Amino acid sequence: MKDRTQELRTAKDSDDDDDVAVTVDRDRFMDEFFEQVEEIRGFIDKIAENVEEVKRKHSAILASPNPDEKTKEELEELMSDIKKTANKVRSKLKSIEQSIEQEEGLNRSSADLRIRKTQHSTLSRKFVEVMSEYNATQSDYRERCKGRIQRQLEITGRTTTSEELEDMLESGNPAIFASGIIMDSSISKQALSEIETRHSEIIKLENSIRELHDMFMDMAMLVESQGEMIDRIEYNVEHAVDYVERAVSDTKKAVKYQSKARRKKIMIIICCVILGIVIASTVGGIFA
């Protein structure tokens, strides 16, 4: 009969090597994934910083009837940078999402997959929060520009309702603001100049909002769909923590009871020994 011991040993070593290779590959994959997570988080933080800077530029522009071109250019650069960075974040989150869906399609389930899903959901929510803040900042700036236009129209003697002003803005025609205004004073000319400036700012703003709208809605819908999953994960984590705390408490009680039982056992043994000595002494005395 042929001895297959060496063959089986070689096959086992080969299987062990394969297991090690798979583990190393998986660890390397997760390391690369966490590097990607940190990169995305850095991009989101950068957007948040730029949004705060945009707010400061808005205030500076509104504080001046005729803001300098440098400030306006810096604002446009910030908005352009936010758009580019947001598109990068969206693309990377989409890539992670597709990778997760592929593994789910193969019915794979692992701790690594759950970690990736949780990280993806967390980043998506943070991204939408930052972009929501940016959207709110833009909307607030539009309202403030609109208020300045309305006040300047009043200076020229032209009163408009909010609805009428909105219609004028939507027309996209700056000449509509000059109709009915008598340009017979420097005040009227200055007021019209600021109106045109604010109208130009609103047009740029609306273009920016329009460009980001589809991306924002896409990510918002993704986060909403993930809401239930996140809630389930948080529920399971909370209950797992409760379970662990109860287990620790029960273990402490068990140790305490075990310690008491051990002490009782020792005391009983000591009593038995003493009793044995007494009995032995008594019996010895009787026979003596």
Curated annotation (Swiss-Prot):
Gene3D superfamilies: 1.20.5.110, 1.20.58.70. The gene is STX1A. It comes from the Eukaryota. Residues 287-288 are extracellular. This is Syntaxin-1A. Belongs to the syntaxin family. It comes from Homo sapiens (Human). Residues 1-265 are cytoplasmic. CDD domains: SNARE_syntaxin1 (cd15880), SynN (cd00179).
